[in-house]
UniProtKB/Swiss-Prot annotation:
EC number: 6.3.5.-
Protein's name according to its UniProt entry: Aspartyl/glutamyl-tRNA(Asn/Gln) amidotransferase subunit B
Reaction equations catalysed: L-glutamyl-tRNA(Gln) + L-glutamine + ATP + H2O = L-glutaminyl-tRNA(Gln) + L-glutamate + ADP + phosphate + H(+); L-aspartyl-tRNA(Asn) + L-glutamine + ATP + H2O = L-asparaginyl-tRNA(Asn) + L-glutamate + ADP + phosphate + 2 H(+)
First-tier enzyme category under EC: ligase
PANTHER family attached to this UniProt entry: GLUTAMYL-TRNA GLN AMIDOTRANSFERASE SUBUNIT B MITOCHONDRIAL AND PROKARYOTIC PET112-RELATED, GLUTAMYL-TRNA(GLN) AMIDOTRANSFERASE SUBUNIT B, MITOCHONDRIAL
NCBIfam families attached to this UniProt entry: gatB, PRK05477.1-2, PRK05477.1-4
Gene Ontology molecular-function annotations: asparaginyl-tRNA synthase (glutamine-hydrolyzing) activity; ATP binding; glutaminyl-tRNA synthase (glutamine-hydrolyzing) activity
Subunit structure as annotated in this protein's UniProt entry: Heterotrimer of A, B and C subunits.
InterPro entries given in the database record: Asn/Gln-tRNA_amidoTrfase_suB/E, Asn/Gln-tRNA_Trfase_suB/E_cat, Asn/Gln_amidotransferase, Asn/Gln_tRNA_amidoTrase-B-like, GatB, GatB_C_1, GatB_Yqey_C_2, Gln-tRNA_amidoTrfase_suB_CS
Protein family membership: Belongs to the GatB/GatE family. GatB subfamily.
Gene designation: gatB
Amino acid sequence: MKCGLEIHVQLDTRSKLFCRCPTDYQEAPPNTNICPVCLNQPGAKPYPPNRSALEGALKIALMLDCRINPEITYFMRKHYNYPDLPSGYQRTSIPVGLEGELNGVRIREVHIEEDPGQYKPDQGTVDFNRSGIPLIEIVTEPDMTSPEEARNFLRELIRVLEYSGCARGEGTMRADVNISLEGGKRVEIKNINSIKGAYKALKFEMIRQKNLLKRGVEVKQETRAFLESQMITVSMRLKEEAEDYRYIPDPDLPPMKFTDEVVEGLRERIPEAPHLKVKRFMEEYGLREEDARVLTSELELADAFEEVAGSIDPEFAALWMRDELKRVLYYNKISFAESMITPGDIIELLAMIRKKEITSKAAKKIIEEMPLNKKGPREIATEMGLIGIIDESEVIRAVEQAIRENPGAVEDYHAGKEAAINFLVGQVMRMTRGKAEPERTVELIKERI
């Protein structure tokens, strides 16, 4: 199987690509964020291209290791008829970035285009609020050989786009998938709006084409639509070629050239790409790849880890941030950036554990209270009465009492039920109000039973 992708994602700008209409179309009433330009009314001329969109596209191209097109850049008119395209053509630039690479997949080109409106054929309505919003299109070479590879590539690409701060992420992603099997012809699949959808579409299409080839039936070169509700693809039309779109330079828009000075200025401002950060975290901090990927899942989380690792043992910091911090963020359905937790808060909490001011069990309770809380970990610990680790003699007394009062758990442990130990540890924690160290408590229990 050979697979290539064309990914479209909205750029995060305040105004549209060729006019000054706002881009917050999702909450606006239908056909309110519009003007004669984004409706392509007769006599309406486009503004010069949105500078933020151009810079965003260049930043993303650089993060994908593309070389920036040194030639004059200009916009073309791509002609086709559809109800969401009032002019009968879509403005799309020639490539701004070429010959990049991500996850072992070659990037053929990166360019900018305008989003069409939203057509709802079941209702017979068109909303032009989205019309003219800047898109970035990323075109890969057909380097992926399985649905899993395509899914992994898309996940990594979304991470790059989120790190860039220039794109709106998976929620605005639309992908076209090109797939061919040996002995068959290339088929394009449209109407894919998620990473999961791309994976399911490829799985279905791969099986469909295999079955056709086994029966000696020709695989037609065509465009198919993915029906997400049924997880199948259906034929739309024969595959178009570039000449079918009748590309011509747009006479209303001036050509542009990105100077070396502009490109290098942008290169200095782009963040380290997530896949490069993963590699550096493994080399610099001795982390496993799995841990490094979790800690780089958000740019803000990765930056926080680096700050914490400057004061706390990196492996200890990674353990707590990977397991406990991510657990709490997931439970609260918020990102690290939204949590209001600072690197200083994490340093303070981990230092309290290291100094044996609190137990690891107490620290887990404290970190659960930290999101969206203006109080620091020490203040939270004081209010909850969690400061202090009791003397071991008190722990021993609690252990012996737990063993005496729960002979059934002791018998279960001797019968091979390891979970019985956890029950006894829980009893000790209850008696000591969580101030006994769980690991040492387990040792004391095992010594006595």
